[in-house]
Amino acid sequence: MRRLRLYLLPILLIVLNAPVASLAAAREPVRARHGMVASTNEVASRVGVDVMKRGGNAVDAAIAVAFALAVTHPVAGNLGGGGFMMIRLKNGKTTAIDYREMAPAAAHRNVYLDKNGSLIEGEGGSLVGYRAAGVPGTVRGMELALKKYGSGKLTWAQLVEPARRLAADGFSVTYSLARSLHGSREYLEKYAETKRIYLKGGNFYKEGELFRQPELAATFARLQRSGPNEFYEGETARLIVADMKRNNGLMTMDDLRGYVAKERTPVRGNYRGYEIISMPPPSSGGAVLIQMLNILEGFDLQKLEANSSVRYHLMA
């Protein structure tokens, strides 16, 4: 059977060691003999390339890039969130790591309903504010991936270092970052800390400006010195819980201590002779992807005009 494997890393696709293509480059295929790194930010992608040049494997690179994205892509890549990782080993085995956020123990089925049973909008609801935050899984997820599937050639501290350096020294704000910060203006200006971090002199950072994050650099430095447990049991954990208490959040020290990243068995399906391997629940992506492709198998796409409305309808 021909095989097509789809792998989802935290906003990251990694195969093995290679150059990075600029988004501004012409839309020509990018080829590499030994593999490649791709993410939503070129600076972060180059971190992954450097890791592999130093002897690290794809998992090492994915970890370093994930941490770098916590600096360069705060809209999605961050220490305070979570994600999924798909890994294919050299022997052909595939596995999945689930490090999505978990609900705090104090959360309950009506936590986002007001006294009248209506959904709370804005502050206090499921999307905005301290009560919307889940227990972060990123650090535990990277820890599990490194312990089980890292090359063993690079240490935890070495993989964290590029992100620490980026946060301390700063990086040039991209157009997409400037745009996303401005698009989140309503929420970033609402809280004193986000306003202080993401605004300079009352204005959002602009494309090309240097963006430094000293507090984030200090967090990475603590992770380097004390390891992953620092985030869940040490000074960083205490800072998170104290901020939650000040702002009516739900997360406690017990929630952080109790977080566990899990290794799961990927879901599998078939599409026109290809085997599809993807992320299992709690991600809906893999199951939905396979269902979509199974539906498409009932149609002869080759007979449809490339730009026909029927083809667009089916593919959408």
Give short role names for the model-derived ranges.
Residues 25-46, 50, 58-59, 63-233, ...:
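Noncatalytic scaffold domains of N-terminal-nucleophile
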Residues 7-19:
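Bacterial N-terminal signal peptides
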Residues 1-6:
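Positively charged n-region of N-terminal signal peptides that target proteins for export
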Residues 298-316:
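Internal maturation/activation junctions in enzymes
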